[in-house]
Regions:
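Surface-exposed amphipathic alpha-helical tracts and adjacent flexible/coil segments at the periphery
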Residues: 1-174
Length: 174
């Protein structure tokens, strides 16, 4: 069950896919599941989330059962958009959600399989004109990367996390 309101498409996709992988790995081989726990945690940590505690799980609460000093969200990756149309030449068309530029390193999250880290090679706007960046959310962009883009691929970019966002150590996962 995914808790909370207003979860982004990126959050739901990452959590659902990672949990599905964990369940499938466990039923294939419980040791494979145990070996992959660091991977599952790393993937989930790429979502926007609030810091975690164990709460009441291990018994009565202690001072560490609640986070008192910082109740902000940790955001390690930005959602750039989801490919809505795959073109024959390997490019993909999508509605951009956050700014990025040609030359940026992005991560392609496939519906199944491994994520692919790649560079943005070129972008065209709705008129087919080359653009260096796409600063306007909602802009329809045709994107070319070093790999073939397919419908439902999610494009995300690692966000630079400032020192203020990393206070407390455990919140910083980059």
């Amino acid at each position: 069950k995914i808790e909370g309101r207003m979860k982004t498409a990126l959050y739901v996709a990452v959590v659902s896919r990672t949990y599905r992988q964990a369940i499938d790995d466990y039923f294939e081989d419980p040791q494979k599941y145990i070996d992959n726990i660091p991977y599952y945690k790393k993937e989930i940590a790429k979502c926007t989330y609030r810091q975690f505690t164990t709460g009441f799980f291990f018994g009565p609460t202690t001072h560490d059962s609640q986070i008192y000093d910082n109740n902000t969200y940790v955001k390690g990756y930005e959602y750039l958009g989801t490919i809505h149309e795959s073109l024959e030449d390997g490019r993909g068309v999508f509605e951009q959600k956050n700014k990025f530029s040609v030359g940026d390193e992005v991560e392609i999250m496939k519906p199944t399989g491994e994520n692919i880290v790649t560079k943005v090679l070129s972008m065209q706007d709705e008129k087919g004109e080359n653009v260096d960046s796409c600063p306007h959310p909602g802009q329809r962009i045709t994107l070319q990367t070093e790999c073939t883009l397919q419908e439902y691929d999610i494009i995300r970019k690692e966000k630079e996390v400032s020192g203020d966002e990393c206070e407390g150590g455990s919140a910083c996962h980059s």
